[in-house]
């Protein structure tokens, strides 16, 4: 099976969920066989966080050009992300998705994601913003554990052969899977 998150052929496993057995990626856990394909409408704000300006610009442009987001907020650090999110929460402005690079300094993507969940609790937001971790590294067990703690959370490998066209196709497919249920998920209790 090909995993759009990892950007390569992967080993898979079966998982019981939603009343059926799903085939999932053995690296990142993304369901690979879905019953419907959804192309999400470009609504809401997507926040992109990456300390590499090339990828920050690439993702911002792809989200806009592919119609996956009506508004894109770009942040060059985890600290900037948390500041921008706090301001949006105070103004009660929604965020549809947060895309976080994992390897950033001094505040990495996982720490920023955990801080996001704390902010959501502090602002008493009923819905958790889906998080998409974006990295050149393969999904490790530590990342899968962090994704569980930050749920709903997903993973997209930057890919070594990621042309803008290939990355756009993988992002469209992943967005369809993330938003197939209609958007943000309830924050775990």
Which residues are covered by each model-predicted region?
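Non-catalytic signal-transmission and effector/linker regions of two-component phosphorelay proteins
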Residues: 1-45, 60, 66, 124-127, ...
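Conserved acidic segment of CheY-like receiver
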Residues: 3, 43-55, 59-63, 98, ...
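Helix N-cap/capping motif at the beta->alpha junctions
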Residues: 74-87, 109
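Active-site residues of response regulator receiver
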Residues: 96, 101-105
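The feature encodes the CheY-like receiver
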Residues: 105-108, 139
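Short amphipathic alpha-helix used as the core "switch/output" element in two-component signaling
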Residues: 110-126
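Hydrophobic/aromatic residues positioned on beta-strands within the core alpha/beta folds
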Residues: 134-135, 158
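As written
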Residues: 145-156
